[in-house]
Amino acid sequence: MTSRKIDIYNHVMPTAVLDYMRDVSSAAPGMIKRMTTIPVLYDIEARIRMMEQWPGYEQVISVAIPMESMAGPGDSPALARITNAELRKICDGRPDKFPAWVASLP
């Protein structure tokens, strides 16, 4: 049996979150450009391939941005909902790799 190694607060940037930020945030262009240069932030299959180098390696995921810097009071509740839904999808799809996520608040 392989022992579990759980690493917490690993940053991800789901593409749906990037898309929403593109639509609502004036700070987004620079942040999105930086985020999209690192495939394991937004490409979960690439992340899983990287993780498979270490048997039993799991991640508790969180978003790679502070919500308040990407959306104002009018948009941050929707951004938090989208973010939490996307992180849940990732965890539900691969609970063997992502047993939990850190929820975001507006």
Locate predicted features.
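Helix-coil boundary/capping segments in enzymes
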Residues: 1-106
